[in-house]
């Protein structure tokens, strides 16, 4: 989870084009899931059409029932009750299975999209490059995009599409009923006689058009406000998680007042934006509720003269009222769905930005090539490293590390030592040159702070291999070697091990991983900085003993570790007149 850069993202809030929307929605419907997806969709549409048909039947039933009540025809009244029971039973069954199949289609779509987005986010280390390229990002919090926005996209898209289709079918089913039963409207104006056939149809169209226009005019800022609300909520949640992750450091620094101030500032953003949403929603609700309530009485007001003149019966009056309501509700799809549309559009915008970030990260031009070759040495040819802004960090480096050789990288803090390790791990794209690693030599990279997945200790020790890949006896042996024997009885205990273990224990656990996975190349980026000197030296001495022929490239500041290495790569600051960028001197280490 990361905090966003608001200026660029806010400008992207309303930019999702129809092409981007189609690019987000289309893939699932042409994928290997398409047959099941289309079958479910067609089944849902068929059920929805069935509900429209039942509503048409109920419209006629409504007319007959009020006519029966007006004529006090008790036998026909009982017959209509039985008829209603059958229609109601079928309607309820259709409604239940329509929702059930819609939920089934939704989870299929969401699961398919989530797995594809996870693949894209994790492929080519896009997740890492997105975090590194903060200034050019269009989206924030990839976890929220995948977990929440994909859910909203699938749910809202189905609701909107199915609702629109049902409204369209309802409109065409009832508009001819309304036309036929409303009859003509005759009046005199401007000295002429006028006749409007099916006048209720024109009234309902005008009524819905005016209402939709008013709602759109009032509610159009809601998309941007919804976008910002999600952003502010994510930033607040991110701040809370940061306090949890660094609870010990915050406590030691007595940083509670500062953390509270920062969290309160983010909470203030949520409150201010929420008040804006409340004010806009209040105006929107005034228009929507006035529109909806007046629609109840409007058809009766317009039809009442014909009823009181005896031109139509009570049943026809109620049929007109019901048909008017059905047509008005169908034409009001935009009004009824406006809040969902605003939320859907905000989700589309965020996903479009996230999609663009992933594509840009995956397609980032690579002038620094990391390849594999059939030899046994690690070679660096013309390697230059840069900062993301293009300024030079490391000047040309040509070097070769033979199989079994141990290299110590040293130099002042911030000179690019860790970046060189990242470049060899193929996660730093800024630079040029060529790095070649042995093809048949699996590698492991140990950062200063190791990643410990939440779960059992066995899973944390086995990572990145699957849990259960190693026998207990082997795990226990290496726990003892790394001075973690006290953890041997807790292999199946699930915990947040990054919180349960001290920094030194976490680094020793990372060495257990190395011994278990037995790589041929080991890169250590201050991977023992939290250990005591005796333990650190014991583990460095164990590397060639437990992994004969292993190649080690490590960064360390303690000179006591030099004796475990063959060569030193010393980062030297540029001399006067040399320009920016450190250079590397390769120096043999006398044993």
Language-model regions: role of each:
Residues 219, 223, 234, 238, ...:
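Cytosolic ends of transmembrane helices, especially the final helix of ABC transmembrane type-1 domains
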Residues 5-30, 43, 47, 52, ...:
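Intrinsically disordered cytosolic tails
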Residues 6-11, 72-75, 104-107, 117-144, ...:
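Short intracellular "coupling" helices and adjacent cytoplasmic loop segments at the cytosolic face
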Residues 371-591:
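ABC-type nucleotide-binding domain
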Residues 1-55, 60, 64-84, 98, ...:
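Membrane-integrated ABC transporters
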Residues 43-46, 50, 59, 94, ...:
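A hydrophobic transmembrane-helix motif
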Residues 54-63, 67-70, 91-129, 158-162, ...:
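Juxtamembrane helix-loop junctions of ABC transporter transmembrane domains
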């Amino acid at each position: 989870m990361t905090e966003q850069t608001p200026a660029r993202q806010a400008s992207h809030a309303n930019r999702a084009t129809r092409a981007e929307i189609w690019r987000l929605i289309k893939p699932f419907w042409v994928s290997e899931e398409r047959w099941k997806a289309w079958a479910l969709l067609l089944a849902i549409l068929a059920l929805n059409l069935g509900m429209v048909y039942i509503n048409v039947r109920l419209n006629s039933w409504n007319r007959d029932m009020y006519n029966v009540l007006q004529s006090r025809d008790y036998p026909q009244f009982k017959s209509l009750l039985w008829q209603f029971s059958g229609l109601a039973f079928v309607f309820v069954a259709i409604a239940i299975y329509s929702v059930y199949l819609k939920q089934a289609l939704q989870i299929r779509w969401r699961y398919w999209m989530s797995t594809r987005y996870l693949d894209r986010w994790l492929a080519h280390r896009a997740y890492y490059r997105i975090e590194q390229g903060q200034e050019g990002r269009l989206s924030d919090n990839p976890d929220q995009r995948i977990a929440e926005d994909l859910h909203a996209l699938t749910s809202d898209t189905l609701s909107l599409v199915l609702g629109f289709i049902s409204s369209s079918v309802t409109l065409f089913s009832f508009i001819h009923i309304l036309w036929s039963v409303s009859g003509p409207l005759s009046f005199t104006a401007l000295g002429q006689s006028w006749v409007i056939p099916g006048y209720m149809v024109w009234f309902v169209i005008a009524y819905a058009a005016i209402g939709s226009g008013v709602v759109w005019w009032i509610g159009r800022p809601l998309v941007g406000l919804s976008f910002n609300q999600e952003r502010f909520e994510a930033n607040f949640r991110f701040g809370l998680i940061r306090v949890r992750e660094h609870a010990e450091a915050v406590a030691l620094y007595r940083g509670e007042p500062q953390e509270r101030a920062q969290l309160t500032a983010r909470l203030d953003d949520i409150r201010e934006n929420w008040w804006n949403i409340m004010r806009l929603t209040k105006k929107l609700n005034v228009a929507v509720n006035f529109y909806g309530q007046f629609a109840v009485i409007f058809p009766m007001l317009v039809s009442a003269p014909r009823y009181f003149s005896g031109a139509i019966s009570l049943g026809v009056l109620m049929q007109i009222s019901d048909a008017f309501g059905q047509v008005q509700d169908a034409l009001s799809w935009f009004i009824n769905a406006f809040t969902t549309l605003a939320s859907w559009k905000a989700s589309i915008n965020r996903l479009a930005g996230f999609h663009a970030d992933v594509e840009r990260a995956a397609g980032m031009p690579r002038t620094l090539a990391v390849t594999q070759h059939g030899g046994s040495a690690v070679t660096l040819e013309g390697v230059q490293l840069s900062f993301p802004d293009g300024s030079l960090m490391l000047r040309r480096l040509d070097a070769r590390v033979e199989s079994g050789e141990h290299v110590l990288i040293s130099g002042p803090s911030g000179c690019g030592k860790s970046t060189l390790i990242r470049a060899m791990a193929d996660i730093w794209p800024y630079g040029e040159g060529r790095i070649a690693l042995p093809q048949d030599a699996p590698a492991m990279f140990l950062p200063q702070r190791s990643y410990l997945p939440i779960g059992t200790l066995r899973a944390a020790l086995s990572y990145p291999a699957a849990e259960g890949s190693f026998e207990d006896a082997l795990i226990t042996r290496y726990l003892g070697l790394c001075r973690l024997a006290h953890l041997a009885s807790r292999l199946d205990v699930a915990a947040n091990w990054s919180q349960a273990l001290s920094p030194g224990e976490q680094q020793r656990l990372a060495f257990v991983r190395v011994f278990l996975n037995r790589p041929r190349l080991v890169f250590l980026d201050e991977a023992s900085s939290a250990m005591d000197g005796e333990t650190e030296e014991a583990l460095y001495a164990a590397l060639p003993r437990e992994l004969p022929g292993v190649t080690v490239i490590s960064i360390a500041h303690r000179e006591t570790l030099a004796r475990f290495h063959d060569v030193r790569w010393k980062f030297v600051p540029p001399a006067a007149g040399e320009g920016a960028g450190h250079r590397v001197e390769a120096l043999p280490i006398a044993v």
